[in-house]
Amino acid sequence: MAIRYGTDASETINGDNTADMVFAGGGNDTVNGKFGGDQIFGDVGNDTLDGGFQNDMIDGGEGADKIYGGSGDDMLAGGLGADTLTGDLGDDIFTVGELTELTGDKIDGGIGRDTMMISFEDSAKGITFTAADPTKSTSFYGATITGIEQFFITGSDKAADNLTGGRWTDMLTGGGGDDRLTGNGGTDILSGGLGNDILSGGQGSDMLSGDEGDDQLSGSYGHDTLEGGTGNDKLDGGNGIDFLKGEAGNDTLLGGNGMDTLDGGEGNDTIDGGADNDTITAGAGLDKVIAGSGNDTVKMTINQGKDTVDGGTGTDRIDISGISGTFTAKAANLTNTLSDGTTIINIEDYTLRGSSGTDKFTTLGGTDYLYGEGGNDTLKAGAGNDFVYGGIGNDAIYGEDGNDYLDAGKGKDIISGGTGTDTAVIDASDLGTTAVTFSVSGNKGTLSNGTTTTDVEIYKITTASGNDVLKAGTAQQVVFNTGKGNDQLFGGNGSDQLNAGEGNDKIDGGAGNDTISDTGGNNTITAGDGNDTVTVDVLAASAGGDKTTVDLGTGNDRVEFNDGIGSTAGVFTANGGTGTDHAVIDRSKSTANLTFTLGTHAVLTNGNVTLDNFESVTIKGGSGKDVFKGGNLNDTFMGNAGDDDLQGLGGNDLLYGGAGKDKLTGGDGNDSIWGNNGSDDAAADTLSGGNGNDNLYINNGDTASGGTGTDSLYLDLSNVTTGVSFNFGTGTVKVNGTTSFTEMERLDFKGTTSNDTVKGGTLNDVLRGNAGNDVLDGNSGDDTLYDGKGNDTLKGGEGNDTLIREDFTGKDIFDGGNGTDTLSFAISGDTSVKLDLLNNALNDGMALGLTVTSIEKVIGSGKDDDIAGANVAEQIFGGDGGDALNGRGGNDTLNGGLGADKLTGGTGNDTFVFDDYSSAGDFVTDFKRGEDKIALDLSEFGLASNYKLLLVQGADPVATTTGATFFYETDTNRLWYDADGNGGDEEMHLVATFDKVASLSTSDFLFV
């Protein structure tokens, strides 16, 4: 950030294209921030301060100052004196330190969602304030304001305030006294402070805080958050999905419509969930809970008060913590009394969280959650799909009817699933080296620690480090997880997961699509029928002379093993069996010269891997000179270091040469071939695509041949310091003394750090200049060209090309050529764009030094831009930020994008596109009915493709249906959108203001 200091004399200080900090000093100064987010301090004197582009902070100081925010979200303070403050484009904030600073000020927020921040906390009198329509000028404590949408106001600490917001987001703080705060539209923040306050959010998703006192909070429409604070408060959520928290005091909480969350907090509270599915928490105190209609959940902790709970209609749940001893649920229409005197009625589902002692819970129908925690518990879930957790101890768990999930935890447990498809979870991880056996016969399962099961279909069992034998038997499905030890795992007919740890293991998957993993040891794995996946990790034990044999059986299977495999201490043998099978071999740590040719019987020479009946492979080589040959399907070979020879043969193969002088041959199929692994490689690689549409990636020193098909060359010379010059063609092209290619149809080029001259081919090429004074010519096709640093010349040629400016330090020439060509600043970083297609001498910011011809479409940056077209038809898209777009002559299409934009079509039949209404709306300066059109993006407005425009207009237009409606205010020239018409739940959103346009009709609109 450049820091600039003025003197006490009157002077002019100009910023640059970066962020400046300017202290103007005394005198009547003129300061122009220009580009960048500037900080400007006027000090004493009648100053003229202009922030220019981006988000500026300007303080006028003493004197009658003229302050212009320019584009961007600016923060403006006039200081003492009769000041003129203009926000212009962007969401600006006007701050006032003392009320006397407002005297004589003229404040205009301009275009955007602008905010006035002011505090009256020292006022002896209460403040009465109502936000005015921003289109109208109004007197405000000695100032004249217009164009202010939002107010952040702090009321008096000494008296009662009455503060009312507008259609946008307001922040109103009451201070002392019994205040009345009304948010109206927008996402408002209301804080009552001291006193007995009345807060109403209105439309929008508001946040209301009563703070101290006996407060009344009403959310009304929207998804609101209401917090009562201390005192006996009344909270009413209204419509929407609301969060209500009573906090301390005897509070009344009303959820209203919507799926609300209500928390009474401390005190004797009355909580009414209202309609929909609510979540209610009864805290400490004697609470009365009426869940209302819907499927509600009531949460409570026993012994915090004698509560009354009525679930109301719907399927309701009660969640009770700290319950101990015996509890038996009753029918929903009967009253159930807890040990602390709490009564429950109209509850269908239970969540019971037990104690460390011996608990006995019995529930009826419904979906119940029972937690035994510690102790020897008896848990009976009854009918329904239940979840039961025994915890530590010797528990008896009964799922009974339904598809139940029964987690016994640690201990000697009894598990009974009952009818339905039930799952048992057994944790034997505390048994250490003790061998564990498990088997299922008929409807009974037996674990050697004494745990028994009855009528369970699915098992999940975890053991420790003994020599375990786990058999699925007649189970539908199993998940076995064993640790160290010589284990035997047998799957069943389902899709099982069998995971063995270190040790000499035997695994049989059985039928079904199984997932099998093993770690270390001399292992025998039989996958069985089905499409199985086997992963072997012997890295930790590769020094122990391990041997692993895998038989995948029938099905389309996959086997994978890590870079420990193939060391001199380990041997791996796999048979794919029938089906289409794939093997993944990681030998990236090997130093040997590996060779492999895929076939019915294939051996990874020097890698101790044998594969039979595999149809495709993925192999990662090490630092040796590897030779890998694939088959007819899709193979992946990674050579890594060393001079490798990789041949894909048939299929769509992926070949990565890595470091070294590699020879890479794709063969048939659409292959992708990298001479390196995504990084620079000084060695000279030879790449051959063969038949098919191939992608070849090379850098300096490599040779590439595409072969037949439509092949793409990705040439990266970004680390080369000597420039190149070549024309892309079908014959042999010599890029420099060491790099060449032939039989390529498409080019993706990254230039050197010096001066490059490159001409593309007939297809859609990508040319990146990098550093240096480059000349890039796309030739024909729809090409994409990037300038980079230096004085560059970009020529699109034939086709619909895109020319992208990444750097503004050079003097560049962009010529789109024939076709509909695009100039884009979309990836230009943090600098705004000032572009004039008619007078390039005015170009500045990211367009500084740029000469442009034959451009039909412009895409701005992610900041606030000023873009003016020529006297021909153009498409101009502003992108993010508050943009100023001017089409000038021709039939132009203007789209401001995100942010509140200023749009001027100029002469011709222009189209104004609106695909966002999240800001304060765009401002159209010259819409002409009968010539220009308003284009609405249906998808961005959430409208169906067959939507028929519903337009209501007048001085105060009122919706006639609950359907999506557009409103045009004839007195303010504003176009609004309401997704639900007169439904009330959705707010109206400002789309645009059309200057001096008295009315609109449906014929002025079109959909895109």
Segments predicted by a language model, with ranges:
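Extracellular/surface recognition and adhesion modules
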Residues: A24, I107, I148, V309, ...
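Acidic glycine/aspartate-rich repeat arrays in secreted/surface proteins
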Residues: D122-G126, P134, S139, I323-T328, ...
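Short "repeat-start/strand-capping" segments in structured domains, especially the N-termini
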Residues: N17-D20, G36, G147-F151, R167-D170, ...
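Low-complexity acidic/polar repeat-biased segments
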Residues: M1-A2, A143-F152, D161, I344-T351, ...
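Glycine-centered beta-turn/loop sites at beta-strand termini
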Residues: Y5-G6, G15, A24, G33, ...
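Solvent-exposed adhesion/ligand-recognition segments of exported proteins
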Residues: M1, T7, T12, D16, ...
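Consensus positions within tandem repeat domains that build extended binding/scaffold surfaces
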Residues: S10, A19, N28, G37, ...
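Acidic/polar low-complexity surface segments
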Residues: V96-G97, S123-G142, T328-T342, S429-T451, ...
